[in-house]
Amino acid sequence: VLSPADKTNVKSTWDKIGGHAGEYGGEALERTFASFPTTKTYFPHFDLSHGSAQVKAHGKKVADALTNAVAHVDDLPGALSALSDLHAYKLRVDPVNFKLLSHCLLVTLACHHPAEFTPAVHASLDKFFSAVSTVLTSKYR
């Protein structure tokens, strides 16, 4: 459960990311594919090479979904219901992949914003990404 302090940390960090969210989403997705090659199996139709326009575009979709989740942090199930359906019923993404991408998002954000990435912010973002992952996998049960 996200505390009020966690929500503040997540919102303020996301505000600082600003217009870079799509860029960071693409970078985190590319990092996920490089670090965890099994995640590539869901994208056989993508050019997965470094700097791929398809990876960047999908990373932007991920970032846009997270931006929506930040804006609706008090109702993540409502905000992410359609994405949960998509990933559970149509794409059938293995739930572990959300944890892997979350880790790579944390690494990417820490690389770009080291001064702001305090232990408290790290913990809050980790809890937020975990909450998002939980919602996205809730329809699997």
UniProtKB/Swiss-Prot annotation:
Concerning PROSITE patterns, the annotation shows: GLOBIN
Tissue specificity comment? Red blood cells.
**Domain Globin: from-to ranges:** 1-141
Binding of O2, residues: 58
Residues annotated as binding heme b are 87
Keyword tRNA-binding belongs to the record: no
GO BP terms: hydrogen peroxide catabolic process
Chain positions found as N6-succinyllysine? 7, 11, 16, 40
Could you confirm whether the keyword Cell membrane appears in this record? no
**Record SUPFAM superfamilies:** Globin-like (SSF46458)
Q: Name one GO molecular function term.
A: oxygen carrier activity
Chain positions found as N6-acetyllysine: 16
Residue numbers of Phosphothreonine PTMs: 8, 108, 134, 137
Q: Which InterPro entries match?
A: Globin, Globin-like_sf, Globin/Proto, Hemoglobin_a-typ, Hemoglobin_oxygen_transport, Hemoglobin_pi
**Residues recorded with modification Phosphotyrosine:** 24
Phosphoserine modification, residue list: 3, 35, 49, 102, 124, 138
Cellular component terms, GO, for this chain's entry? blood microparticle; haptoglobin-hemoglobin complex; hemoglobin complex
The record's keywords, sorted A to Z, are: Acetylation, Heme, Iron, Metal-binding, Oxygen transport, Phosphoprotein, Transport
Cysteine pairs forming cystine bridges in this chain are none
Matches recorded under PANTHER family: HEMOGLOBIN FAMILY MEMBER, HEMOGLOBIN SUBUNIT ALPHA
Tell me the function of this protein: Involved in oxygen transport from the lung to the various peripheral tissues.
Sequence similarity: Belongs to the globin family.
Indicate what this protein is called per its UniProt record: Hemoglobin subunit alpha-1/2
